[in-house]
Amino acid sequence: MKYENELFILNYTEKDKYYIEDFMNYLNDNSKRIMDFFNLEKLSTKITINLIEKKEEIDKIFTSIHNMPAHDFLIGFAKDSQIYYISFNELNNVPKHQNDIYELYQKTIVHEFVHSCNYEFSPLWIRCLCEGLAVYLSEQRDKNDNAFNITKDELFNGRVNYIQSFLFVKYIIENYDHDFVLNLYKSEKFAKENLDRLYDETVEYYQTKNKVK
């Protein structure tokens, strides 16, 4: 089955039909806010969202595109204008998502849409920045979180840590102007010149904040 509007093409099955209207309303309601962040007036092509019925299927698609195994907790990913996302009917069968509720499911599709807009804005992919931004804009974490406790090497070179990446990006967004933030996502040279310093500032910021508490 298929849903289409000016921004999205959604491919889904009969089993998904009962939640699709609400699902797309939520995504549509958040899309302008996300695009505005990247100063995108429109997208070069519609975003195609493919709802996948089984975890094994989405893992195979991920591996075929990225040439690496999928994490056991993977429920969705974006690649350029394509989003692959687990069906809500299958969500609670995926490790670490057994207790996820529909609200979290909605926020995760917004997370993936952030990635699609990020790809549209710039091909540069700095993982901690891009994942942190997707968590921040999709509102998957409490904005009051403040336990920043990751080493510089782990943040920049280790396995993705969504919470720590979120806290890093949160500090940057709340302490720098928008043009500065966007330059981190657009210019590799600019990012390399600033990331080490930004990490040090972030550590100091959260240490000070926690002492005050």
Regions found by a protein language model. Name each.
Residues 17-28, 99-104, 108, 124, ...:
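Soluble non-cytosolic domains of exported or imported proteins
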Residues 24-82:
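Auxiliary, metal-adjacent structural segments of Zn-dependent hydrolase domains
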Residues 35-39, 114-123, 138-143, 173-177, ...:
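Sec-exported extracytoplasmic/periplasmic mature domains
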Residues 120-161, 209:
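Post-HExxH zinc-binding segment in Zn-dependent metallohydrolases
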Residues 2-19:
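Acidic/histidine-rich, surface-exposed loop or edge segments in extracytoplasmic proteins
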Residues 158-213:
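Pan-zinc metallopeptidase signature
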